[in-house]
């Protein structure tokens, strides 16, 4: 029995690794749409079509529950997929939810009016598509008032990480943090709104300074998934565990192995 985890590339492996540590008894089927990565520079409709195709593939492989471990896909496709209707017995969840829960300190099912929260100035680092969608600001506004969000589109970071060029990735992160701080000099919290970015979390933290609380998604998503499966144990599905890619399996396997520093072997989707 496996839970599906989908990402446009390798960033979702940070979510997968946290979920495996939190839920060692659960099997996971990871699906990377490497042939079409990165999603962050694509149009919303393109992202939706690609995401929907991948999620349906995972459902057909027996993964009744699919996690969109990609903020760009969550921002552009999740709500539309849910509005179009999800097949009976199937679920698709996004990675925005745990971030909003952590920042506002309220559960997703809490539909009470928005209220003030402790954090007032929030820096959001995300892909150009996620920033353009304003999905994070929209969901936050449903739950909190008086929060100023300054978003920074981090062009190039995902490409550098996917290519294994961490020196370039670090330089880009520091450049984007500098650009953000010119707009918001003193953020209280920072959201790493892309599942690739936890690999660069120490760099973000160093560039932002020790007084800024950095919210990263891996452990937050893993905790929320554990809670969800406890409430819905039948959603583990009948799928088999493994790693699938729409790209070249050997190339993706090599990059994933470098990414997580342990052997990862992908098969063709």
Curated annotation (Swiss-Prot):
Question: Which EC number applies?
Answer: 5.1.1.3
First and last residue of the signal peptide: none
Write down a Pfam family by its short name. Asp_Glu_race
Give the pathway annotation: Cell wall biogenesis; peptidoglycan biosynthesis
Active-site residues are: 70, 194
Q: Which cysteines form disulfides?
A: none
Homology family: Belongs to the aspartate/glutamate racemases family.
Q: Quote the protein name from its UniProt record.
A: Glutamate racemase
What is the scientific name of the source organism? Ruegeria pomeroyi (strain ATCC 700808 / DSM 15171 / DSS-3) (Silicibacter pomeroyi)
Gene that produces this protein = murI
């Amino acid at each position: 029995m496996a839970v599906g985890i989908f990402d446009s590339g390798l960033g979702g492996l940070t979510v997968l690794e946290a979920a495996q540590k939190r839920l060692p008894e659960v099997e996971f089927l990871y699906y990377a749409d490497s042939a079409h990565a990165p999603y962050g520079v694509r149009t919303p409709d393109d992202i939706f079509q690609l995401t929907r195709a991948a999620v349906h593939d995972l459902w057909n492989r027996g993964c009744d529950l699919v996690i969109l471990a990609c903020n760009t896909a969550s921002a552009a496709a999740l709500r539309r997929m849910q509005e179009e209707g999800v097949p009976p017995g199937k679920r698709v969840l996004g990675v925005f939810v745990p971030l909003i829960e952590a920042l506002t300190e309220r559960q997703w099912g809490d539909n009470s009016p928005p209220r003030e929260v402790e954090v007032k100035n929030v820096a959001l680092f995300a892909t150009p598509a996620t920033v353009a969608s304003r999905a994070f600001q929209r969901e936050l506004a449903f739950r909190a008032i008086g929060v100023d969000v300054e978003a920074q589109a981090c062009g190039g970071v995902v490409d550098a990480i996917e290519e294994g060029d961490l020196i370039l990735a670090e330089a880009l992160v520091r450049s984007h943090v500098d650009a953000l701080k010119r707009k918001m000099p003193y953020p209280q919290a920072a959201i790493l709104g892309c599942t690739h970015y936890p690999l660069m979390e120490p760099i973000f933290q160093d560039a932002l300074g020790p007084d800024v609380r950095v919210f990263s998604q891996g452990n937050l998503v893993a905790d929320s998934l554990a809670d969800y499966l406890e409430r819905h144990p039948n959603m583990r599905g009948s799928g088999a565990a493994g790693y699938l890619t729409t790209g070249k399996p050997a190339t993706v396997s090599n990059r994933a192995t470098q990414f997580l520093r342990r052997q990862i072997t992908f098969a063709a989707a």
